Amino acid sequence: MNLFEFSELESSFRQLGLDKWAKVVADQVRGVIKNTPNGNLETWGLALQRLPKGTAKSNNLSAPRIEIGATGDLSPETEQLMLQGLREMHPWRKGPFSLFGQPLDPEWRSDLKWNRLEGNIGDLKGRLVLDVGCGNGYYSMRMVGAGAEAVVAIDPSQLFLCQFHGIVQMMAEKPPIHF
């Protein structure tokens, strides 16, 4: 997904049967990016370019430490570029993640909160979930890992948007999360 275009967001909403909201939401997101630019947006865009694209051979969205790829999937050079890009999108508030065997430890242990929530939110299998205040998408990914058919993720932070797209672009197959 082109981070600044959002045409994929619009088509995703249509696929979910949310036609009425597709253009409205995409236009609002475009407006936020245009009218409230973050001074770090260019840096984060460059950081996204350093991250590998579609190279993970496997993903585990149900693990406490979400796993994208495995050790040895990347060349040493690509791994160093990835680590540099991830550092440039600091701080990482939600997680943890394992990206091609490299731990990405966040400020908050979201896996511990998920453990408390998981038994109280009901069965997610086949459900469409709205994740308001999704941060970088950690919980959205865990919901997909728990069987949600799709997640619509909303957060006003442009950093979290970049972090989410950075994680997802490394996956071989994009999860049904619409941020």
Regions found by a protein language model. Give the residues of each.
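S-adenosyl-L-methionine
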Residues: V168-F179
